[in-house]
Amino acid sequence: MGNSSEEPKPPTKSDKPSSPPVDQTNVHVYPDWAAMQAYYGPRVAMPPYYNSAMAASGHPPPPYMWNPQHMMSPYGAPYAAVYPHGGGVYAHPGIPMGSLPQGQKDPPLTTPGTLLSIDTPTKSTGNTDNGLMKKLKEFDGLAMSLGNGNPENGADEHKRSRNSSETDGSTDGSDGNTTGADEPKLKRSREGTPTKDGKQLVQASSFHSVSPSSGDTGVKLIQGSGAILSPGVSANSNPFMSQSLAMVPPETWLQNERELKRERRKQSNRESARRSRLRKQAETEELARKVEALTAENMALRSELNQLNEKSDKLRGANATLLDKLKCSEPEKRVPANMLSRVKNSGAGDKNKNQGDNDSNSTSKLHQLLDTKPRAKAVAAG
């Protein structure tokens, strides 16, 4: 961008009579001022007045162009063109949307890389509006598209004001859109203010202009850069912006949390099942070892029992033989004893007989001696 003296002068009017101007009594000079007031609140400082003559005097131009003028209450009812949903979710543009994932900080409300695109239906007013549209486009990190009511051409009006004035200074007033509508994306970086061909290029912080889609509505918050996209803007249209769109709705985060909890439960169940399976396997192996030890001990006891049974059988056989031997040896011992007893008994009987005989002989002798007379009588009688 160069100084105001370097800007091309508009061609002088010819002497031919021009057509009578169209009556523009009800047309506002700033067609999108109400939309801007709806989007800006007391938290965001509005740019001051910009005088192009200051650039010619050698002073650096201020970053803003006009002072704030509150035409509507900042916390009033939301503007229908900006908040088509009625303001139920987004009560004010300064309020962040939803909750962020854990471990991340809240993005700033407004950062130098913010891109605002507001399209409201306006009417084309010829060269006057065209000139105003060219001058009201440069902000310090806040790029706002000012269109003529066509939503498909609203985001294509992000142009550098000085370059557009150099290239489109002589366009007719029938169309309120600036040239370069086919430019889909515009990248700006705030790395410095280089000069090229004696013209100072004021570069704002990096932002990407995106074109709104016809079906999408609502305001989307870009995570990381703190940018608020206009209604219907798709952030996937730029590959550089797709990386910063990590903001996920709370329902998705809740679903992800449920899935993570479910996976943790499944993993814990698998681990517990594996531990129980290993414990049961260890118990089974220990029981198998005990069974083997008990079976071996049982076999040893059975073998000892068999040996004891064999020994008992042998002892029984020996006892039987001894009993038989005892039975055979008892009669031989009794015969001599009987013989001796008989001998003794017979000796005593003989003595008794001899003694009785002797007694009878003596008595008979006594009788004979005593009975001599009766015998003689008997003999005499006989």
Swiss-Prot record:
GO molecular function, one term: sequence-specific DNA binding
Region named Basic motif: 261-280
bZIP domain sequence ranges: 259-322
Segments of this protein annotated with the region Leucine-zipper: 287-322
Region (Disordered): 1-26, 97-221, 257-285, 329-382
Low complexity: compositionally biased ranges: 166-181
A Pfam family assignment: MFMR_assoc
Biased composition (Basic and acidic residues): 1-16, 155-165, 182-199
GO BP annotations listed: response to abscisic acid
Keywords (A to Z) from UniProt: DNA-binding, Nucleus, Transcription, Transcription regulation
Subcellular location(s) per record: Nucleus
GO cellular component, one term: nucleus
SUPFAM superfamilies linked: Leucine zipper domain (SSF57959)
Composition-biased stretches (Polar residues): 111-130, 202-216, 357-366
Tissue: Present only in dark grown leaves and roots.
Function recorded in the entry: Binds to the G-box motif (5'-CCACGTGG-3') of the rbcS-1A gene promoter. G-box and G-box-like motifs are cis-acting elements defined in promoters of certain plant genes which are regulated by such diverse stimuli as light-induction or hormone control.
Subunit structure: DNA-binding heterodimer. Interacts with GBF4. Interacts with BZIP16 and BZIP68.
Similarity comment: family membership: Belongs to the bZIP family.
Name of the protein in its database record: G-box-binding factor 3
Originating organism: Arabidopsis thaliana (Mouse-ear cress)
